[in-house]
């Protein structure tokens, strides 16, 4: 724990002379999920050759249960009438609200099993710098289900393929099985920096006081100077697994096919 002391001081200094004020939360205690969240739908692979279809507010894939959001990856054939049918279903949810800067936190227990890919991340509300990744992407927490002690967070920017940039935590191992219990995963986003947190401890910082794409972004910190919304999803397979083979029948060996979220919260520094 002592290794986190200095980053915590940096976190305090980045937002000195004020206090965090909670201004958005979902504790998943009831009500219609669609009041606060959009459901993104389809079987198009989502730019990553993913193996699931995302469905629309369907209890088998996204439900509130015992004060939690439960997103489940289910092996079943599904289609959207446009793309080839897929052998898995799941859910991908985005907040109706969007923000520039603040503290973002999720308390969750992650799935466990080959090629399960939960994510807590953010995309720009308006792609003011152009299509992905020009307008940025903020990955707060991603995870591979066959590596239950490893998480990562990333900023994506620039232009694919030649000028695409990625900075962030890299693949970070912890003495924790993230599928065994609930943990908090967070991001402190100020005009000057992004700080990734695990259980309230800062474990990585990236400065925003730089030009991420010289000659295209017009000021330091761009494209992370616009409003972003939150995404929660659970994918199956795809490019994230680096070409590692996966047969759908291997899902029979999944130890835990659910991404359980106790809450998502957002604070502003005032």
Curated annotation (Swiss-Prot):
GO terms for biological process: carbohydrate metabolic process. Pfam families: Glyco_hydro_16. CDD domains: GH16_laminarinase_like. Ca(2+) does not affect the enzyme activity nor the thermostability. Other cations, such as Mg(2+), Mn(2+), Cu(2+), Zn(2+), Ag(+) or Hg(2+) do not cause any serious adverse effect on the activity. Also no significant change in the activity in response to the addition of 1 mM EDTA. This is Glucan endo-1,3-beta-glucosidase. Hydrolyzes laminarin majorily to glucose (G1), laminaribiose (L2), laminaritriose (L3), laminaritetraose (L4) and laminaripentaose (L5). Hydrolyzes laminarioligosaccharides L3, L4, L5 and laminarihexaose (L6) to G1, L2 and L3. Hardly hydrolyzes L2. Does not hydrolyze lichenan, pustulan, carboxymethyl cellulose, locust bean gum or soluble starch. Optimum pH is 6.0. More than 80% of its maximal activity is maintained at pH 5.5-6.5. Residues 1-18 form the signal peptide. Residues 22-270 form the GH16 domain. GO terms for molecular function: glucan endo-1,3-beta-D-glucosidase activity. It is an enzyme of class 3 (hydrolase). It comes from Cryptopygus antarcticus. Its EC number is 3.2.1.39. Gene3D superfamilies: 2.60.120.200. The active site is at residues 137, 142. The keyword Ligase does not apply. Optimum temperature is 50 degrees Celsius. Retains 20% of the maximal activity after incubation at 60 degrees Celsius for 30 minutes. Retains approximately 15% of the maximal activity at the temperature below 15 degrees Celsius. Keywords: Glycosidase, Hydrolase, Secreted, Signal.
